[in-house]
Amino acid sequence: MERVLGKSGTHTHFRGNECVSPIYPPIDFQSLLGRDAWDSLPAPVRRRFGPHAAEGLSTLYEGEMEVRANPFGRLVAQACRLIGTPLAPWTGGAVPTSVDVHLDPRGGLVWARTYAFTGRAPVLVSSTKLMTDRGELLEVVRGGLGMALTVTAEDGALHFRSRRYFLTLGAWRVTIPGLLTPGRAHVIHREASGGTFRFTMTFDHPWFGRTLFQDGLFRDPA
């Protein structure tokens, strides 16, 4: 169990009986990666994750996704609908998908993904990346569920890997045992060609294997 603390306000605090939301510093991916690793990334990747991303600008990417899940992954995705749909609840191929990246008022960056599964209403899956003043990168969704992430640059691509899952309860982050999660998350952002990039996301569970898989090609806005 971890108390959410921080000198710059990255902690939940109270004003009287009112719980005040934390304010997080802007995400600086260059600082998280280190200068050499950052410079090894293609210019379009640096542009998408560069300082402009923290200036309040909204960017819309459109493309198609392949969305797959094994039985355990489908069970977890459906159960998570109780806390705001942090995982796509359906599967399909060539699913039209849009991603709106914009600033969160608390200082993080929101990735709002809208999936248009055939025969179903559009599904919004939203998560927010936050950086604490201790330099820890977090990704959180509704209901207080989140992951602590590591970010690396490998072979010209940006990689995000989960280190642990947690549930935020008031001023505390409670670690969730790995066996009770969809598994270790691994997200890859890789430059493609012609103003496009590939987004790949996998979850691997120690008992249930590859629980969730998503892969898609997205276009930069004109």
Question: Predicted segments — roles?
Answer:
Residues 10-12, 16-20:
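Targeting/processing segments of secretory and organellar proteins
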Residues 204-210:
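Exposed beta-sheet edge/beta-hairpin loop segments within beta-rich domains
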Residues 217-222:
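Short beta-strand-to-coil "C-cap" segments at the C-terminal boundary of structured domains/repeats
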